[in-house]
Amino acid sequence: TVRRSVASASPLKPEIIEGVDICFVRELTGGIYFGEKRREGGVATDVCTYTEDEVARVLRLACRLARERRGRVTSVDKANVLETSRLWRDVATRVAAEEFPDVRMEHALVDAAAMQLLQNPRAYDVVVTENMFGDILTDEASVLAGSIGLLPSASLAEEGPGLYEPIHGSAPDLAGRGLANPCGAILSAALLLRHSLGLAREAETVETSVYATLRRGLRTADLAGSNDTTASTADFAAAVANEICGDGQGRAIA
């Protein structure tokens, strides 16, 4: 979600990004990243494979999430040229029609989706796509918020615990310097509360505490403007913790 408090950090115009709220669902265990790879002489090959079950599993998750949001899913593929994408689109259409008739399913080619993401990001609610396309589109989407350090993620299975982490890498060049933005990590904890522990109110408390801290003009270096107070990683995290503990629900979390 792009909030007004950080809209100035985005390279896009405020009227384009304010209020943008997109949930990306990326398939993580299949596709070209996990296909057969070989190199012989001057020829290299990467094989992209998807099964109906793999596609149906991630589509069901996207549709369940859409039911909790605005009820719309955009399935992104390259069905005009790729056989795996044609399978993806067929399965997406069937799962939505047979199992989630209350969810509006739309299809988009990945190149058009990448363009629309910058021109009119409010057009999207839940975006679901295969592994490589999701890898690219989520990094592109980080530009909307102004910093990749703001964004959380969850790796979810149909059953069992999830894995929660910010979408950025380890950034070893920032280690020990107090420059990293902790928002992605803190908001990932909120996702854990909501999706693995079923604690929606507590998750909302964490999220609103992050946004309240940003509204006060406290920023880490990646977001700070001329009128903002630049905080270290530890100072920003402490300010969020104070917001959480200042709330009755927050004290219960602590």
List where the protein language model places each region.
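Short glycine/threonine-rich loop-to-helix capping motif typified by GTGT followed
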Residues: 82-93, 118-124, 142, 216-224, ...
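Glycine-rich phosphate/nucleotide-binding loop
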Residues: 1-2, 118-218
